[in-house]
Amino acid sequence: VLALQATGFLREHYREPISIHDLSDHLSYSPSQLTRSFTRAVGTPPIRYLASWRLHEAKRLLISEGLDVAEACYEVGYSSIGTFSRRFTRDVGLPPAALRRSADWLAEVSLPPVSLLRPTTTRVRVRVVVPSTLREQLGTEPYQWVGTFPTPMPCGPPCTGTLRRGLVEVLLPVAPGAPWLQVALIPGGADVTEHLAPREPLVARPHRLSDHDDVVAVEVGPARPWEHPMLVALPALWPG
C-alpha cells in the first residue's frame, strides 16, 4: 500500500521540485522509514524513482507529443538542458534528439532480430512463460526482449540481450557485474510509443542469476502500478 501511495504521489507531481521531506509529510512517515520501506518494495529510493519517472514522461513527450528537447526538459521539471540530456542518455541509452529520430524510422519498419552479445564463460538458457489469459493481447509474434543489467532497474543499455519475434528460448551470455535478468514482451502490432516508452508492458519480475543457473524459466505479467518504469529504449539495440 505504501509503495502504491508513494509512487502515485510522485507520478502525479513529477513536474514539481519534490523532496523526500515533501513525500514523507504527505504520507506521514519519517524520511528514513519511508526510504527504507519504499526501496524494499520498489527496488530504488523514492527520489531516484522520481528522476526515472521524469525521464519516462520525457520519452513520451518527445515521441507522442512532438516536443523538442528543450520543451520536454522543462515540462518534466528540469531547469538545465545539459543535465537533462546527460541523465537521459545514461538511463535511456541514447540522447533525447536521437530518440526522436529513432521514433521516425521505427514507425515505418519492422524490427529484425537483434543480438547484443559479448564473449563470456557463463551462459543461461532463458524460457519465457506467458499465462494463457495474456496470450491474446500479445497477438501473433510479439516482440520478446531478454537482457542482463547491472541492477534490478532496466536503466541504460543491457550488457547482453536479444530481440526476437515470437516466444522463443534464447541462450544468453551473462557478463560479470550484470547478473540481473530482465524480460519484456511488446505486442506484435504495437505502435512506436509502445516500443520506446511502454505504459503497461508485460514484464517478468527482475531475476538475479546465480553461477549455478543453466536454465531459467521466467513468467511475465502486467507491470505493477508501483514498479520502476522501463527506461531503456530497447529498439536502440538496433543500429538502424
Where do the language-model regions lie?
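Short, ordered, surface-exposed loop/turn motifs in non-cytosolic proteins
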Residues: 133-152
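A short, solvent-exposed beta-strand micro-motif common in secreted/extracellular proteins
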Residues: 176-188
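Exposed aromatic-hydrophobic patches
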Residues: 166-175, 217-218
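Basic/polar phosphate-binding segments, predominantly the helix-turn-helix DNA-binding elements
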Residues: 17-50, 75-95
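Structured interaction patches on ligand/partner-binding surfaces of diverse proteins
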Residues: 188-225
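Short, acidic Ser/Thr/Gly-rich low-complexity loop/linker segments typical of extracellular
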Residues: 153-168
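…primarily DNA-binding HTH/wHTH and HhH modules…
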Residues: 1, 89-134, 159
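Terminal helix-turn-helix DNA-binding modules in bacterial transcription factors
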Residues: 8, 17, 41-75, 106-118
